Design a protein with these regions (language model features):
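Conserved ABC ATPase "signature" region
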Residues: 77, 96, 100-123
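Conserved ABC ATPase signature
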Residues: 88, 127-134
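Conserved ABC transporter NBD signature motif
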Residues: 56-67, 71-72
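Catalytic Walker B motif of ABC-type/P-loop ATPase nucleotide-binding domains
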Residues: 152-156
């Protein structure tokens, strides 16, 4: 369980995340959806201990985000927007390298499991820098699973991929659902709708709506999720304009 209370991140005069309040259930695949600059990646970076919040409190599996950050790092992992692979190592070398860093017991079994899950057999001997975008993303996520994290952060996992590669990666992410808690950021509406148990819509640093895709469609009174998202964002922008 992740409990977030008034989480805020400020960069000088810019409020990147503004008093975020949210609970994410154990085993849930939760998506943060928003346009560029909405605060999704900043939120992920705070929750994964990469940057400190300006204020607020976060409880992750009964651990305090700031006070217990070293313990939290043992139970989480992240696949960032920029693929986290060693470009001059082969796919297999990348997996063994990260297994060594995390001191994974029975690492051969874990590596075989990940190779099978992500269908990496045919590219094992290729250097990471020669891989297609789809395979680079697969390898990056495989690496983030090497330590069996209880919580996995996927920051824009299909960013820049063609539609075939994107759908292929969705199938893998679907297989992970329920086995670990997943927090995914995306600006692809179809991705959030297809994969998520629940979706949080962010705009200008704030969480402005929360629910399943069906609940959000119902709240917005639209025919589909894309129209619901657009309406929710536009109404929030108009509300902020009127306040100003």
């Amino acid at each position: 369980m992740i409990k977030i209370n008034n989480l805020t991140k400020k960069y000088k005069d810019k409020l990147a995340v503004d008093n975020l309040n949210l609970e994410i259930k154990t085993g849930e695949l939760f998506s943060l959806l928003g346009t560029n600059g909405a605060g999704k990646t900043t939120t992920i970076k705070m929750l994964s201990t990469l940057i400190l919040p300006t204020s607020g409190e976060v409880d992750i599996n009964n651990l305090d985000l700031v006070k217990d950050s070293s313990k939290i790092k043992e139970i989480i992992n992240i696949s960032p927007q920029e693929t986290a692979v060693a470009s001059n190592l082969t796919v297999l070398e990348n997996l063994y390298f990260m297994a060594g860093i995390y001191q994974i017991p029975n690492k051969e079994d874990k590596i075989k499991e990940l190779i099978k899950l992500f269908k990496l057999e045919e590219v094992l001997k290729q250097k990471a820098k020669t891989l297609s975008g789809g395979y680079q993303r697969k390898l990056s996520i495989a690496i983030s699973l090497i330590n069996n994290p209880k919580i996995l952060f996927l920051d824009e996992p299909t960013l820049g991929l063609d539609v075939i590669s994107r759908h292929d990666l969705w199938k893998v992410i679907e297989l992970l659902k329920g086995k670990t808690t997943i927090i995914l950021t995306t600006h692809y509406m179809e991705e959030a709708e297809v994969l998520s148990d629940r979706i949080g819509i962010m705009n200008k640093g704030k969480l402005i709506e929360l629910g399943t895709s069906k609940e959000l469609i119902k709240k917005a009174k639209t025919k589909n999720f894309e129209d619901a998202f657009i309406k929710i964002i536009e109404e929030d922008n108009n509300e902020n304009t009127n306040i100003c």
